[in-house]
Amino acid sequence: MSQQPEYTDWQQIVDLVKHSVEQKQHDMLLTMLMTPDEREALVSRVNIVRELLKGELSQRQISQMLGVGIATITRGSNELKLKSDEDKARLNQLLEGTKKGG
């Protein structure tokens, strides 16, 4: 009998996070799964996507504002280009609707 990991694909992780939200355990789960650097990188990625969707700043300006490399901005931009206008609108609405002060 070969050993296999319990979680093998992205959808299982999405389902795990969804379940943790339903159980009001998402903060604990995400804190335990991600290092401080990974959490910081995720915050940067959310800000990159948000700024790209707003379209008010150049990639260079976003890079300078967030203190990340231009290649990181480009990767975010390339991912957004793969999404439909409808998906981008939904993502923008989601990001806009959850803004909170630190």
UniProtKB/Swiss-Prot annotation:
What this protein is reported to do is described as: This protein is an aporepressor. When complexed with L-tryptophan it binds the operator region of the trp operon and prevents the initiation of transcription.
Domain of life, source organism: Bacteria
Q: What is this protein called?
A: Trp operon repressor homolog
Keyword field: Cytoplasm, DNA-binding, Repressor, Transcription, Transcription regulation
Q: Give me the positions annotated for DNA binding.
A: 59-82
Q: How does it assemble?
A: Homodimer.
Q: Does the keyword Repressor apply?
A: yes
Organism lineage reads as:
Bacteria, Pseudomonadati, Pseudomonadota, Gammaproteobacteria, Vibrionales
Give the Gene Ontology MF terms in alphabetical order.
DNA-binding transcription factor activity; sequence-specific DNA binding
A single GO CC term for this protein reads: cytoplasm
Please report which protein family the annotation says this sequence is part of.
Answer: Belongs to the TrpR family.
Q: Where is the signal peptide?
A: none
User: What SUPFAM superfamilies has UniProt attached to this entry?
Assistant: TrpR-like (SSF48295)
Q: Where in the cell is it found?
A: Cytoplasm
Q: Which GO terms describe its biological process?
A: negative regulation of DNA-templated transcription
Q: Which Pfam families match?
A: Trp_repressor
